[in-house]
Design a protein with these regions (language model features):
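Short, contiguous acidic and Ser/Thr-rich linear segments
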Residues: 50-72
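Generic recognition of long tandem-repeat/solenoid scaffolds
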Residues: 56, 114, 128-139
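Short loop-to-beta-strand transition segments
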Residues: 75-129
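Preference for intrinsically disordered or flexible, low-complexity segments
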Residues: 22-25, 56, 86, 90, ...
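Short, ordered beta-strand-loop transition motifs
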Residues: 36-38, 48, 124-132
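Non-catalytic macromolecular-recognition regions in eukaryotic signaling proteins
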Residues: 33-36, 51-57, 76-78, 83
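Charged, low-complexity intrinsically disordered regulatory segments in eukaryotic signaling
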Residues: 1-51
Length: 139
């Protein structure tokens, strides 16, 4: 199953203590209540815009609704960007006299390059044959 979304991550949630109530959000075609997984724990692979892919696991009450999965994805990105900020030595913004428009690559745990968190949006989500949720992330 592949779900096409085009949801801007920061419009869905801002920080981990600011999770949006899925009942207040209506996704395209009202799919927010759609059951997408019946496991108690899910795994999501994050690979964009990272130099090294990251597999994160999330516990939740089953079944997982699409809105719950999106909240987990957003929380995962916040965690990844926070870890990068805690472990990097290079600046995350380009100097004012630089011609670089996007975020420069940093040398932290994940090697984030090209985009700040606010640039990202979820294009689609799908479950791989190994049971891991995979993401198409745009910017």
């Amino acid at each position: 199953m592949k779900v096409d979304l085009n949801i801007h991550i920061m419009s869905w949630m801002c920080r981990e203590d600011d999770v949006i109530d899925p009942d207040l959000i209506q996704l395209k075609n009202n799919h927010e209540q759609m059951i997408v997984d019946i496991s108690e724990r899910i795994s999501i692979r994050f690979d964009y815009p990272l130099s090294h892919s990251v597999l994160l696991q999330f516990d939740g009450k089953k079944p997982w609704r699409l809105a719950d999965l999106i909240n987990a994805i957003c929380a995962g990105y916040v965690k990844i960007y926070d870890e990068e900020d805690e472990t990097r030595t290079l600046p995350a913004s380009a100097p004012l006299d630089s011609i670089l428009v996007n975020r420069p690559k940093t040398d932290g745990k994940h090697g984030i390059w090209g985009h700040i968190l606010n640039d990202l949006y979820i294009e689609s989500i799908y479950k791989g044959s190994d049971g891991v949720w995979l993401l198409d992330i745009g910017s």
